[in-house]
Amino acid sequence: SSTVFANTDIKGGVAVTLYDVAREVGPIGVFSSFGELRSIQKKVIPFLSDGSLDQIMFLQNKFVLQELYADYPEAKEKISSDGKERRIVTSSFSKLSCFTEHQTSNDAVRILGLGESNRRIYKWIERKYIEDNGNLDNYKVIVPKANGTGAIGEVLSTPLIGEPLIGYTQSFIGIGSVSTESEAEAILKYVKSKFARAMLGILKITQDNPPERWALVPLQDFTLASDINWSKSVSEIDQQLYAKYGLSNEEINFIESHVKEMN
């Protein structure tokens, strides 16, 4: 796109389509400027019938507003949409006194968010004030909801394992809701793998990182019964994934050369 539009950064590029009345070539589908990614995608798509990673992703926790306003009526004036916004947004930590620096009771849970200079911090809140978003009571992997620029192969900004009773604000999304830490460690290794991030890069063309961008990343079995040995290193797991999806040497070399390593 920079060749046609000088000094302009168009994240998704520019697609030029031609029409030939004499040919029927079918729909474009998901467009990628890399031929290797298109061929990898064709090999992976049949496996998506078994699930994709976006199906086990969970957005931020939400407030139970009735409970919150019963104890903190002043919060209604500080919550957007005339006090109807239920999502725990990035600014909730600084605006609402229901969040505390220290645990105030055995029923309090920790919430991961961003403080000054976008530094990651945890604050406490009584559990009765928040809904269970589907993974609050279980292990999960927490990743930023916005990351990088959308370039193929970028690293994810410090994904981490969230223990049970840890939630998160709108700045993050959670992957998985599993009962054991070993399963969460397997998920963490998977999202660090070059293969998974290559598949993510097909749909992620901006910094935004919502669940739908992970729709082409095939779901895996993260238990000990998996066909992938999750006890191996991330690079060794990549080799297993390349074999599972039948990638050619050319396709493997493309991923290895275009996707940055994460350990």
Residue ranges and their predicted role:
Residues 3-169, 176-249:
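C-terminal substrate-recognition regions of SAM-dependent nucleic acid methyltransferases
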Residues 250-263:
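Short, amphipathic C-terminal "tail helix"
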